[in-house]
Structure formats: structure tokens, C-alpha cells
Amino acid sequence: YLLSMTPSAITTSDAGAGIGYTTLRVRGTDGTRINVTANGIPINDAESHNVFWVNLPDFASSVKDMQIQRGAGTSTNGAGAFGASINMQTGDFSLKPYAELNGSYGSFNTHKETVKAGTGLINDHWSFDARLSNISSDGYIDRASVGLNSYYLQGGYYSDNTSIKLITFG
């Protein structure tokens, strides 16, 4: 539901709470015609070209910027950018160590807990960040509960002319 207020975008959710199996349509085209990338790397399924957002629970907590280009556009992985192109950029490294604990609660026993931590810049070149999340909801519809856990790990080497970043999430 992060994109639900975007002009010409429609989002739906099976459970009715915006968590779990959700779909996105832009300018009337379904998800198979929307090219979605994270840091320029395709997120779309290789076979159906759809994006299964349920496999990216709380990925938005690690996104610093998102660009949406509505309509036909260039595609990085085939001819799927007829409806739109969405590029998500993950956060940069932090110069100082940090730790965050976030929690939220809403209707239908919907709650989210997130723990984030980062080392800051180590020896002026290395940085590591991590996030753990839990999202749960009873859902608006009977027997439509959701329980999702996710992680995000990022490590990188940074210098004046070089930036190498390794990211894994699930």
C-alpha cells in the first residue's frame, strides 16, 4: 500500500489490510507489465514477469528513494515496462554507528516490529547494516491472517573512487 496514493496507481490486498498478497496496477496495466528494480536489479519473476510483493515484506524499511515512471519506458529485463517502471534505491552507508527499534500497531491486530543496526564507517572504508522485521495481522477478512518475517543485510567497501556494496534480503 506504499504506492496507493500515487496518481494512476491502484493497489489491492487479499486480506484487506495491505499486508501479504497485494497487487499493483498502474494506468490500468497489471503487474506483469510493470518493470520493478532494486538498485537497478530486476525484481520481476523471470517466468511470469509479475512481482510477488509478499516475498518482499517490509523491504520499504530499507528503501531510501523510489522513482516511478508511468507509461511506456525503458526496461532492464525484457519488454515489461509498458505500464510503468519502478526503481527502488536502498539506503547508503552510515558514517556513525546506530541502532533503531520501531513498532507500530493498527486495526485488525495489525502490528509491525523492526530492529535496525549499523556499524558506521569502520577503518574509513567498511560499513555493515542489518534489519529484522516482523509484520502480523488478523486481516479484515475472516481467516485472512498474515505473519511475515524479513531480514536485510548490507555490507560495503567505500573509498574516494570505489564503492562496492553487497546486499541480501528475504
Q: Language model features by range: what are they?
A:
Residues 42-70, 89:
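Short acidic/polar hinge/loop motifs at secondary-structure boundaries
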Residues 63-68, 84, 90-105, 128-132:
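Transmembrane beta-strand segments of Gram-negative outer membrane beta-barrel proteins
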Residues 77, 93-98, 122-126, 161:
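Short loop/turn motifs that connect adjacent beta-strands in outer-membrane beta-barrel proteins
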Residues 48-49, 68-70, 97-100, 134-138, ...:
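Extracytoplasmic loops and strand-loop junctions of Gram-negative outer membrane beta-barrel proteins
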Residues 3-42, 64:
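Extracytoplasmic beta-strand/coil segments of soluble accessory domains associated
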Residues 105-136, 141-170:
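Transmembrane beta-barrel wall of Gram-negative outer-membrane proteins
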Residues 13, 73-77, 102-105, 140-143:
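Outer-membrane beta-barrel domain signature
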Residues 23, 53, 65, 85, ...:
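Membrane-embedded beta-strand positions in outer-membrane beta-barrel channels/transporters
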